[in-house]
A protein has these predicted regions:
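Secretory targeting and sorting signals
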Residues: 1-22
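Extended, solvent-exposed regions of the mature portions of secreted/cell-surface glycoproteins
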Residues: 23-148
Length: 148
């Protein structure tokens, strides 16, 4: 009977455990009609990790795996470091509570966000680089008519 109770307890705990998903929630505006003339997007971030931050980068779409990203925009203007840790903010991280903006490029070295799909790749920062729990891929598109 003790073994049965122990097994039942383990099963109950396993069923009640939340699935693996990023705790940080990110909203992008605009997401699917980014201006070609003024390509700036705004992020609203909630649920940041308490002991480290996240990176947000403009990249080519990796397909189904976040680890599959091959080409990201090398421009510092197309990257964000977001953290609510004071020491990180002292080193240049943006607070997750304010207005977060990012300039994105239509084209960058090895990247074409007009004719292919681009994404914002979200990962844990250097303080938790091996932890993949915050990995997210958020697709975005430039708006308007392509005259090519």
């Amino acid at each position: 009977m003790k073994k049965f109770t122990a097994v039942l307890t383990v099963i109950a705990l396993a069923v009640s455990m939340p699935g693996a998903s990023a705790a940080t929630k990110i909203k992008v505006s605009p997401q699917f009609k980014v201006s070609k003339k003024n390509p700036v997007v705004t992020f609203k971030v909630s649920g940041l990790p308490k002991d480290h931050g996240i990176y947000i980068s403009q990249c080519m779409d990796p397909g189904r795996k976040p680890g599959g990203v091959k080409v990201c925009n090398p421009s510092e203007a197309s990257k964000l470091w977001v953290s609510n840790v004071e020491a990180d903010q002292a080193m240049g991280a943006k607070a997750g509570t304010g207005k977060l903006t990012l300039k994105v490029d239509k084209y960058f070295e090895g990247g074409d966000c007009i004719h292919t799909t681009c994404v914002f790749l979200v990962t844990n920062d250097h303080s938790a680089a091996d932890d993949r729990s915050e990995d997210q891929v958020i697709k975005f598109k430039f708006g308007g008519i392509n005259l090519f």
